[in-house]
């Protein structure tokens, strides 16, 4: 063996050239690249969910401040007083204060408590409207948050709400059954409709690896066109109506009103709170929830521990869809009992994504975030009626909240909050989950 060759007869590899490439490693490079991108996506989602409550609070404050800037810019008196800003600056700043304070005061009175009400019913009506509007947001937000914690981006809550409302509404206006039985079957039908619709994305993800974001977005469009077609059929269309409207929901299938006929608040709100408690127990105390968290923390480690990732994916999507379907039941069986329309879901499915992010995908946080967004919706109507502020400002504030929640470092930089160091709670929880799975 010469000094220029190895014992096997090959030329030595220069140290600066690094190790020789291995064909097997080259073939695995695309797979590793795909896994790296998936890991980055999961890491971003964890950072969003792990922003602490201080960051969340300041994100809302920042969004409200920017909303105040837009309110001032949209006010006619502010624009008029800007013409003599240097001559009378106090008039300009006074106009800004009156516009912003008046708008947010009206927003509060329309969402929480109206001190100018003539009686108790008028005073507490705003908070009951907030709870009514927040009900579908809480249901759908719980489903989306459950998917987030399991590593799935379920963007299809809008379509799942529609399918839940379709099936629940069909049972509600077609069959004549005893009171309790009819309501239970209609609500279960709504949950089943949402679960089946979400399971399509889950099965495609589990069997073919299809991206659940794209599939659920496409299913949203399919659901929108599907309900439009169904309302043109004899089975769904109200007899004698020229509009795409179904028959009214029978009294036996409606959610009972909690405070009497003068308020719209119904039993669905209490069911949403019970659903939040159920999701908490599922994710924190059950074996199935442990599997969900393990797959969300590290699918490869979960697979090594013997957990069926495809089966878990289908289960997660089905449960998330059933919760979104219950959001549809809250609409058709509780709030909009006059009949099924193609706008029954409004934009609750899309707003629920923000609710889940703001609530950090936790049940308690989701309930609070749902109430916040319900209050913005309820108060925005009075804000526009009393001050003339465009109700679109509310949508802009919601968008700013999404922006700041999705960028915790930006919020920390704006308000000079200390940066977090060490292991995050997500990493600690992932390590704990891995230990539990290994045990």
What is each PLM-predicted segment?
Residues 196, 262-338, 363-368, 438-439:
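Helix-loop-helix "hairpin" substructures at the membrane interface of multi-pass membrane proteins
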Residues 52-56, 129, 133, 156-165, ...:
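Alpha-helical transmembrane segments of multi-pass membrane proteins, especially transporters
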Residues 318-324, 332-399:
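Transmembrane alpha-helical segments in multi-pass inner-membrane proteins
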Residues 106, 110, 216, 220-285, ...:
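Transmembrane helix-bundle core of multi-pass membrane transporters
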């Amino acid at each position: 063996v010469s000094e220029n060759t190895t014992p096997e007869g090959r030329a030595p590899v220069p140290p600066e050239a690094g190790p020789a490439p291995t064909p097997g490693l080259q073939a695995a490079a695309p797979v590793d690249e795909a896994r790296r991108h998936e890991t980055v996506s999961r890491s971003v989602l964890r950072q969003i969910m792990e922003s602490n409550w201080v960051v969340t609070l300041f994100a809302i404050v920042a969004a409200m401040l920017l909303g105040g800037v837009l309110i001032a810019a949209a006010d006619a008196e502010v624009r008029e007083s800007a013409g003599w800003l240097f001559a009378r600056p106090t008039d300009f700043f006074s106009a800004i204060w009156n516009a912003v304070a008046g708008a947010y005061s009206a927003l509060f009175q329309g969402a929480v408590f109206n001190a100018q009400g003539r009686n108790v019913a008028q005073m507490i009506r705003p908070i009951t409207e907030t709870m009514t509007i927040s009900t579908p947001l809480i249901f759908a937000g719980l489903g989306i948050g459950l998917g987030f914690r399991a590593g799935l981006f379920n963007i299809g809550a809008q379509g799942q709400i529609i399918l839940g409302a379709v099936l629940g509404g069909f049972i509600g206006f077609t069959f004549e059954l005893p009171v309790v039985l009819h309501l239970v079957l209609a609500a279960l039908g709504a949950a089943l409709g949402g679960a089946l619709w979400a399971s399509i994305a889950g099965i495609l993800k589990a069997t073919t690896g299809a991206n659940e974001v794209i599939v659920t977005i496409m299913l949203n469009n399919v659901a929108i066109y599907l309900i439009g077609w169904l309302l043109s059929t004899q089975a769904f269309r109200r007899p004698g109506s020229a509009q795409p409207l179904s028959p009214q929901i029978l009294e036996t299938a409606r959610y009972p009103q909690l405070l009497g006929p003068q308020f719209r608040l119904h039993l669905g709100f209490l069911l949403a709170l019970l659903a939040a408690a159920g999701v908490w127990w599922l994710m924190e105390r059950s074996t199935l929830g442990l599997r969900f968290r393990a797959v969300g923390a590290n699918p490869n480690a979960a697979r090594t521990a013997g957990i069926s990732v495809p089966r878990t994916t289908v289960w997660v999507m089905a449960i998330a869809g059933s919760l979104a379907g219950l959001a549809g039941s809250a609409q058709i069986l509780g709030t909009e009992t006059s009949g099924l329309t193609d706008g029954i879901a409004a934009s609750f499915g899309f707003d629920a994504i923000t609710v889940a992010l703001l609530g950090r995908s936790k049940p308690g946080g989701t309930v609070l975030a749902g109430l916040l967004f319900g209050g913005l919706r309820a108060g925005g109507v009075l804000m526009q009626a009393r001050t003339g502020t465009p109700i679109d400002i509310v949508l802009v504030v919601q968008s700013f909240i999404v922006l700041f929640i999705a960028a915790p470092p930006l919020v920390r930089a704006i308000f000079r909050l200390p940066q977090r160091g060490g292991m995050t709670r997500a990493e600690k929880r992932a390590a704990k989950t891995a230990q539990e799975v290994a045990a």
